[in-house]
């Protein structure tokens, strides 16, 4: 008769993606974390390079007129005319808006779930959004481009943006500015690498009646997924109470203390009118 394995009392069974499985072992080299963070930020940073797609997509249908300026945006979502550049560029607006909203909504979840799980979810959303965008281009449905790269991809941007920053700051409390700068450098450099790569891919896939953007989306999704998953699996978090050798936290002083002593939690802050005025 088969026996059912019993869980040892006091020992939790954690999944491979759980935060507990990412706690670094003693002697772990913290300088192995920045490459993992850069791998994710270089991929999602391509959001700033999407402008290379707008002109080819505005001429995607051969022998078809462009959508007229009088056409409403809702009608254009399902129209069979060539899309306007302004309508395509709205995808970037969705990127940035959803990035901020998702970072605010799921920032607390990231701290509980850990950067590895957040990195995997970011890869699925960002690359899945690109794949859905490729489908939208093939079907000539603008709403799928807004939904795929814009909204779903925007969620991947938000999670992919904050997880490297949060992790690096934990590993480099003595060099917070440098840690944040390394992560942001990757986000800004993503377009510098991704945009020329996208242009080369479009030239490779293009034909007389196809600008090759859909195939480029799929190729980028595959490339980015590999790098983002490798980056997410490379994440480690320091054990509780860890600090760099020879470093002691600076004593509190006027330059480091908060202006207010009320320490408003995010769950309370977002319910205040001041939060929305700043946002």
Language-model segments: which ranges?
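A structural feature recognizing the 12-helix transmembrane core of secondary solute carriers
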Residues: 1-279
């Amino acid at each position: 008769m088969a026996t059912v394995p019993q869980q040892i009392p006091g020992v939790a069974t954690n999944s491979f993606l759980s935060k507990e499985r990412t706690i670094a072992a003693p002697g772990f080299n913290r300088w192995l974390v920045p490459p993992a963070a850069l791998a994710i930020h270089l991929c999602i940073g391509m959001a700033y390079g999407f402008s290379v797609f707008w002109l080819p997509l505005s001429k995607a249908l051969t022998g078809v007129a462009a959508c007229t300026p009088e056409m409403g945006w809702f009608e254009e979502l399902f129209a069979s005319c060539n899309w306007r550049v302004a309508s395509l560029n709205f995808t970037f607006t969705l990127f940035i808006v959803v990035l901020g909203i998702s970072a605010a909504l799921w920032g607390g979840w990231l701290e509980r779930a850990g950067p590895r799980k957040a990195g995997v979810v970011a890869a699925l959303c960002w690359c899945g959004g690109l794949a859905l965008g490729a489908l939208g281009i093939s079907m000539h449905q603008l709403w799928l481009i807004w939904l795929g790269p814009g909204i779903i991809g925007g969620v991947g941007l938000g999670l992919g943006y904050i997880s490297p920053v949060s992790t690096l700051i934990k590993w480099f409390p003595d060099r917070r500015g440098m840690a944040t700068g390394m992560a942001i450098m990757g986000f800004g450099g993503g377009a510098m690498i991704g945009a020329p790569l996208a242009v080369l891919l479009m030239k490779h896939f293009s034909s007389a009646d196809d600008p090759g953007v859909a195939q480029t989306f799929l190729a980028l999704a595959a490339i980015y997924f590999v790098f983002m998953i490798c980056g997410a699996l490379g994440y480690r978090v320091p054990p509780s109470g860890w600090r760099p050798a020879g470093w002691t936290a600076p004593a509190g002083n006027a330059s480091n203390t908060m202006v207010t002593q009320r320490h408003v939690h995010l769950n309370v802050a977002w319910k205040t009118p001041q939060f929305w005025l700043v946002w």
